[in-house]
Regions:
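Helix-biased detector of long, well-ordered alpha-helical tracts
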Residues: 1-222
Length: 222
């Protein structure tokens, strides 16, 4: 909380078999500095600031099958605030922004597409993935939330036949403390990636797709 510049104002405790920690966050923002999930423009690229696969790795942890590297990388990703990425993104023109959490990359990309009146294309070959996450998906270590996300959203998604089932599970995988999905001009996205690296950003960010005029489906995964 100190890193985020927040103040803890109160709370309550519970007794449970495993540790839980949650917060309700309130704050203030200038109206001219709000980033919304609507506003993506045809021709934009999509920048994702964290690797995917937290839900898959956590499911493997619960099954006692996760590698030490996978656990370490998942904890590092979940523990990393979006603060540095946000500060770097402030230096360019952001057209839309959302965090990728419980609805997975596909679900939050769909929210952006619907709010913006455009279609988004996710290129699975460009996705950064936590170690062993796809292996766990291939073993069936898939969180229940993934199936709910698919059931709710697949009607608005065109999934190319070449996309393997494990990759499909990955894009619908619910994330805990996921990264930012941002639409912006390509040159701005490339500048952001350079600045993140120079600033010592510990995670892998990258361009994962692009925005087109509205097509038959809001989201295309290929």
């Amino acid at each position: 909380m100190k890193e985020a510049g927040a103040v803890l104002a109160g709370g309550h405790s519970i007794n449970d078999e495993e540790p839980k920690y949650g917060l309700c966050v309130t704050g203030f923002v200038h109206p001219d500095r709000i980033w919304k999930n609507g506003g993506a423009q045809a021709g934009d690229v999509l920048l994702l600031t964290k690797p995917l696969g937290v839900g898959l790795v956590n499911t493997a942890v619960k099954a006692g099958m996760a590698s030490e590297e996978a656990k370490r990388c998942a904890v590092e990703s979940m523990s990393c605030l979006n603060k540095l990425a946000m500060e770097v993104l402030r230096e360019v023109e952001v057209h839309s922004c959302t965090d990728v959490t419980g609805f997975g990359l596909a679900g939050h990309a769909l929210e952006t597409a619907r709010a913006s009146g455009v279609s988004l294309v996710i290129e699975t070959g460009r996705l950064e993935v936590l170690p062993d996450a796809l292996f766990y998906a291939s073993m069936g270590l898939v969180p229940e939330g993934t199936y709910r996300n698919k059931a709710y959203n697949k009607k608005d998604v065109r999934l190319e036949d070449k996309v393997e089932e494990a990759l499909e599970d990955l894009v619908f995988d619910p994330q805990t403390s996921g990264g930012l999905l941002v639409s912006l001009r390509r040159e701005d996205a490339e500048a952001v990636l350079v600045k993140l690296e120079k600033a010592g950003y510990p995670l892998k960010a990258g361009i994962v797709g692009f925005v087109t005029d509205l097509q038959e489906k809001f989201l295309m995964i290929r």
